[in-house]
Amino acid sequence: MADIPAATPSATPFPPELLRDVERRRTFGIISHPDAGKTTLTEKLLLFGGAIQLAGTVKARKSARHATSDWMEVEKQRGISVSSSVMQFEYAGHTINLLDTPGHQDFSEDTYRVLTAVDAAVMVIDAAKGVETQTIKLLEVCRLRNTPIITFINKMDREVRESFDLLQEIEEVLKIDCAPITWPIGMGKTFRGVYHLLEDRVLRFTPGEEKRSEAEVIKGIANAQLDELFPLEVGKLREEVDLIQGASNPFSLGDFLAGKQTPVFFGSGINNFGVQEILQALLDWAPPPQPRVAGVTVADTRLVMPAEAPFSGFVFKIQANMDPKHRDRIAFFRICSGRYSSGMKVKHVRMGREMKLANALTFMANERVLMEDGVAGDIIGIHNHGQLHIGDTLTEGENLGYKGIPYFSPELFSAARLRDPLKSKQLQKGLQELGEEGAIQVFEQEGGNMLLGAVGQLQFEVVAQRLKDEYKVDAIFESADIYTARWLVFPDEVTRRNFEREQGIRVGKDVDGNPVYLATSRYNLEVTMEKWPKVGFHATREHGEKLS
């Protein structure tokens, strides 16, 4: 590592150009339950951002050079929308990084981890269905870092639930205050538009799916034009607005940035209605890249500022088999400070060695594009031949380790069974390496049995395919009778020994050697926790963390 001097945080002001570029960044994710309209909203944000002209036609940034690849065919076979998982576009003098959180059968631990790389989130709620299970899980992940959340209540052009009921449900179920910014006028066939509470104007709804269009604006809720246009709806609108102004929380930027309050917008993504207001809110209210906590020693941490000159960041996702001919793996890397430039040398902190960053990628919908330069908030794709794991930190010399990239307790468990028993060593090696990479969680039980944990069925399918392709191991995954896993922290060695003696096969070890309790049911977990009050049972743990 002699070539790279250790970087220390500078006491001098931040480089002005770097600071300006960082302030222009907005990096956010979209969270929703499947079918709430996330994919549609993503496309419409790109449409309003000028990144696409019509559905399916994509423009990359002018400065980008194209890298050709046949990975799209792999995606079609797999049914995974990987290429659109990170999208960058320019809008109103800002650089927007939009990170997708895959849903449906694509749901995996990656869905959670993506949220560790954003500075804000847009939560999409189906106005007919309200808060749904996957939204609850994703919001819990946002809460780990108090991520600011903007809410978009979608599909107002359909028959939906009462707006006050939806706000109440969001507040009660998600435990976050709502501050309505726009308010709907009617719904379904009588959806007329929204009233903007902060700007005292009505945006009139006109259906139209294809091109971006400006909504017609009527100034003032007392405007007589409203009585002419919406004679049946205007009375109810004025009553509801009086109610909101008297009873609901006014918007507080401080509470929003602290993750305590969500501004709420109503609209119809498929009709481009309400999308521009979301984009504007991201520019006006969502934070630019934020300082990040990084460990500098086992006991000590420091706050890394995004406009510090030395480059640093962390890997939050690894996507394998993008190109089967090359065993192509891409490590998705969030830049946290400094500036990326092609060909730069960096320190791989976990391995303690130098590596060169060349041909890093950025993403624009269906295209991978070679990255020329990037700053905090940007996401780059690094070609990875197994040297990078989820949670790894790269720096320009400083021994940093970014915090806040968690493992989550799996919700599905399987045991691997070999078709060829002579391949057990290859299976063990494959599972160990895939576990270290973060593709799946691997637990070793008493007697050496390997148990796999995932948050989505797709993870098992991808691992089975990779075992076959990369390790020549044909394995069948059979469902295991495990309800959940909890990482254990013991107060002392005596308690540890007594617990392990009593629980026996229920105690396993994860890929880093940390003790884990494998509960067979919720009742089993609750009884065990009650019996051992001094033992910590944790649903998450940090990547690379060694528990006592």
Curated annotation (Swiss-Prot):
Domain tr-type G as annotated: residue spans: 23-290
SUPFAM superfamilies linked: EF-G C-terminal domain-like, P-loop containing nucleoside triphosphate hydrolases, Translation proteins
Keyword Cytoplasm: yes
Organism lineage string: Bacteria, Pseudomonadati, Pseudomonadota, Betaproteobacteria, Rhodocyclales
GO molecular function, one term: GTP binding
Annotated positions binding GTP: 32-39, 100-104, 154-157
GO process terms (BP): regulation of translational termination
Main location: cytoplasm
Protein name: Peptide chain release factor 3
Similarity section: Belongs to the TRAFAC class translation factor GTPase superfamily. Classic translation factor GTPase family. PrfC subfamily.
Subcellular location: Cytoplasm
Keyword Lipoprotein: no
CC per GO annotation: cytosol
UniProt keyword list: Cytoplasm, GTP-binding, Nucleotide-binding, Protein biosynthesis
Function according to Swiss-Prot or TrEMBL: Increases the formation of ribosomal termination complexes and stimulates activities of RF-1 and RF-2. It binds guanine nucleotides and has strong preference for UGA stop codons. It may interact directly with the ribosome. The stimulation of RF-1 and RF-2 is significantly reduced by GTP and GDP, but not by GMP.
